[in-house]
Swiss-Prot record:
Keywords: 2Fe-2S, 4Fe-4S, Apoptosis, Cytoplasm, Iron, Iron-sulfur, Metal-binding, Mitochondrion, Nucleus, Phosphoprotein. Residues 272-286 are annotated as: Fe-S binding site B. Monomer. Interacts with NDOR1. Interacts with CHCHD4. The lineage of its organism: Eukaryota, Metazoa, Chordata, Craniata, Vertebrata. GO terms for biological process: apoptotic process; hemopoiesis; iron-sulfur cluster assembly; negative regulation of apoptotic process. [4Fe-4S] cluster binds at C272, C275, C283, C286. This is Anamorsin. Residues 235-249 are annotated as: Fe-S binding site A.
């Protein structure tokens, strides 16, 4: 039996299931207790009761599962996550499980790659295979009896994984440098600076051809655009012209000017133009005599008597 790197004073958990032979389990526990000594501890736990046992987090240095000779244990994702939880940071998990070498759809037995992925997803690192070997006749019989699985392409895979040296949610102080950084400017290459420098003398030098920006424009570019051409295609369509909200094409101003012209043209006009000022400015024959002054354009109704008198 491999010692799995167990030393004195360590806490070890041994996981077994109904396929584990009792005598083989007892022999394994005795050997582990001899390795851990009086300061260490070996705990034996049934895999079906592991989740209900409520072991404290980070309780064990080593977890062994399915290692008992003759055992054919299958490990679910929940079981693997619980094993990772009870491991101390830096602790190791060793497990053995029958794996399928053929491609079988919806198989309860994992392939080797899927088993490695399951350990990684449970939170373990440095996952690697340790040993592959054929199943013994007793193990093949155990798979059929306890797992109800029949296949001629099974192997026994021993695999290990390590818990990271930190707990989930733990914090660590960052070592930040508080030394004042030099604010010196980078050195400038004189040759490069001279290359990109254009002096006033160069500007007046006739040998230097400078492009006149106005020459880049043709007569068409200098024409003032027609406001109608700037209007949106759908602006003002329909029987009633109406400017859009936040109009920017000029239709709103155009409609406002048309409205002002209509108001001016609709205002009543008099011959002298002074009727609205009051009687002091009205003609002798003005029909508005005797009426108070009014604003220009204000609608004033005249009675029939006033019209006949006028």
């Amino acid at each position: 039996m491999a010692d799995f790197g167990i030393s004195a004073g360590q806490f070890v958990a041994v996981i077994w299931d109904k396929s584990s032979p009792v005598e083989a389990l007892k022999d394994l526990v005795d050997k582990l207790q001899a390795l851990t000594g009086d300061e260490g501890r070996v705990s034996v736990e049934n895999i079906n009761q592991l989740l209900q046992s409520a072991h404290k987090e980070s309780s064990f240095d080593i977890v062994l599962s399915g290692i008992i000779p003759g055992s054919t244990t299958l490990h679910s994702a929940d079981i693997l996550a619980e094993m990772a939880r009870i491991l101390r940071p830096g602790g190791c998990l060793f497990l053995k499980e029958p794996v399928e070498t053929a491609v079988v759809n919806n198989s309860k037995v994992k392939t080797a790659s899927k088993l490695c992925s399951a350990l990684t997803l449970s939170g373990l690192v440095e996952v690697k295979e340790l040993q592959r070997e054929s199943l013994s006749p007793e193990e093949i019989q155990s798979v059929r009896e306890h797992l109800g699985y029949h296949s001629d392409s099974l192997l026994s895979l021993q695999i290990t994984g390590k818990k990271p040296n930190f707990e989930v949610g733990s914090s660590s102080q960052l070592k930040l440098s508080i030394a004042k950084k030099s604010s010196g400017k980078p050195a400038v290459d004189p040759a490069a600076a001279k290359l990109w420098t254009l002096s006033a003398n160069d500007m007046e030098d006739e040998s230097v051809d400078l492009i006149d920006s106005d020459e880049l424009l043709d007569a068409e570019d200098l024409k003032k655009p027609d406001p109608a051409s700037l209007r949106a295609p759908s602006c003002g369509e329909g029987k009633k012209r109406k400017a859009c909200k936040n109009c920017t094409c000029g239709l709103a101003e155009e409609l406002e000017k048309e409205k002002s012209r209509d108001q001016i043209s609709s205002q009543p006009k008099s011959a002298c133009g002074n009727c609205y000022l009051g009687d002091a400015f009205r003609c002798a024959s003005c029909p508005y005599l005797g009426m108070p002054a009014f604003k220009p354009g204000e609608k004033v109704l005249l009675s029939d008597s006033n019209l006949h008198d006028a």
